[in-house]
Amino acid sequence: MDALEITQKLISYPTITPKECGIFEYIKSLFPTFKTLECGENGVKNLFLYRIFNPPKEHTEEKHAKESVKPLHFCFAGHIDVVPPGNHWQSDPFKPIIKEGFLYGRGAQDMKGGVGAFLSASLNFNPKTPFMLSVLLTSDEEGPGIFGTRLMLEKLKEKDLLPHMAIVAEPTCEKILGDSIKIGRRGSINGKLILKGTQGHVAYPQKCQNPIDALASVLPLISGVHLDDGDEYFDPSKLVITNLHAGLGANNVTPASVEIIFNARHSLKTTKESLKEYLEKVLKNAPHTLELESSSSPFITASHSKLASVLKENILKTCHTTPLLNTKGGTSDARFFSAHGIEVVEFGVINDRIHAIDERVSLKELELLEKVFLGVLENLSEK
C-alpha cells in the first residue's frame, strides 16, 4: 500500500481530538509482524508498534532490555487526532476526495498525510542488518497532550523500549516539500500580572491610586520586549501580551487593578527564573502580583547529528532542495522525546492549509515524503 491509499483511509476516520474511532485497529492490521503496546487515560488512546529486524540468534526481548549494546532503534511518531473541521467545506471533511492533484480532507496536512507516508515507508522497509523500527501514535496532540505521547514514552521507559532516534511527521514545510526541518522548538511560558491600585471617583484623583498610571510606565518594558538576542537557530525570546483588562466599564470610576495576560516564546537563553527576575526588576515600584507557568521547555537537536544529516541527505536526493534547519512555530510532541534524551527532528508536508477549511495535501508531496522516509530508514540501517 502506498502513502496515498493509507492517508485516504486515515482521513475517513473522524478522529476529532481525543477520539480514536477505531483507527488503531486499521493501522495494526497493516503490521501483523510488529508487536504492539497500547495505553491511555481519560479517553485518550496511544499505540506503539515495534519490530526488531534480523536479531542475533541469541537475542531475546528479555536480553534486549538488559544488554548495553542494542540494535539502533528508530521511531516514527505522530498523532491521528484532528481539530474540528468547522463548516463551509466544499466536501465532507471525513470523506477524502482527490481533485486537481490534491487530496482533500481534515488532517490531510496535520498530520495524517505524514503518518500515511511513514506507515507506507515502514511497510516497504526490509533491512539486512539488526535494526529496530517502531511507530508511536496518539489521539491527544491537538488537545491538552497530557495523556498522549508523554504518557506513552513513560511506559516505554519502564519497559526499556525508548528509541535512540525519532522523526515526528509534523507539517514543517512552508512553500515546497523539503524546505524546512525542525531541529528544535522554543519553550512557552504563560504569565498573569496584576497591577494593584485603589478604586475611586475620577473627580477625586487624590483619593485614588490608578494602576493604569503604573501600566503606562512599565508597558514599553513588557509588551513585545526581546528577552534575549536568540542565536543561529532560535529567534529572540519575546514577551507578547494576549489580554489586558481593567475597570468596571463606567466612565467615572478608576480601576482597582489591571490584569495582564501574556506569553513568552523563548530560546534556551531564557528561563522562567530569568523572566521572573526581569519582570520583578521592571515592576519594583509598582504594587503587583505575578504568576508564571512553563507549559513547555525549549530543546534542540544538533544540526550535525546523525539523524539530521541523514534526513538532509535524503531530502536533497529526493526533493532536490536543501532544507532550512530551524525552530520556528509552536510546540509539538517532539519536546517529549527530547526530554528523554532522544535525538529527534520534525519533518513533513507543507503547512499552508493546517486547521483550515478545505485542508489538502499534494499527491506529489505524499509520494516524495514516503521516499524520503524510506531513504532515511535504509541509510540508518546501513550505518
From Swiss-Prot:
Pathway the protein acts in: Amino-acid biosynthesis; L-lysine biosynthesis via DAP pathway; LL-2,6-diaminopimelate from (S)-tetrahydrodipicolinate (succinylase route): step 3/3
GO BP terms in the entry: diaminopimelate biosynthetic process; L-arginine biosynthetic process; lysine biosynthetic process via diaminopimelate
Family annotation (Pfam families): M20_dimer (PF07687), Peptidase_M20 (PF01546)
Binding positions for Zn(2+) 1 per the UniProt entry: H79, D110, E170
Disulfide bonds: none
Gene3D superfamilies on file: Zn peptidases
Catalytic activity: N-succinyl-(2S,6S)-2,6-diaminopimelate + H2O = (2S,6S)-2,6-diaminopimelate + succinate
Positions annotated as active site in the UniProt record: D81, E141
GO-annotated molecular function: acetylornithine deacetylase activity; metal ion binding; succinyl-diaminopimelate desuccinylase activity
Enzyme class at the top of the EC tree: hydrolase
Keywords: Amino-acid biosynthesis, Cobalt, Diaminopimelate biosynthesis, Hydrolase, Lysine biosynthesis, Metal-binding, Zinc
Keyword Hydrolase: yes
InterPro entries xrefs: ArgE/DapE_CS (IPR001261), Bact_exopeptidase_dim_dom (IPR036264), DapE_proteobac (IPR005941), Peptidase_M20 (IPR002933), Peptidase_M20_dimer (IPR011650), Peptidase_M20A (IPR050072)
CDD domains for the chain: M20_DapE_proteobac (cd03891)
PROSITE patterns assigned to the protein according to its UniProt record, in alphabetical order: ARGE_DAPE_CPG2_2 (PS00759)
HAMAP family listed in its UniProt record: DapE
Similarity-based family: Belongs to the peptidase M20A family. DapE subfamily.
Subunit architecture: Homodimer.
Record-given protein name: Succinyl-diaminopimelate desuccinylase
The organism of origin for this protein: Helicobacter pylori (strain Shi470)
GN (gene name): dapE
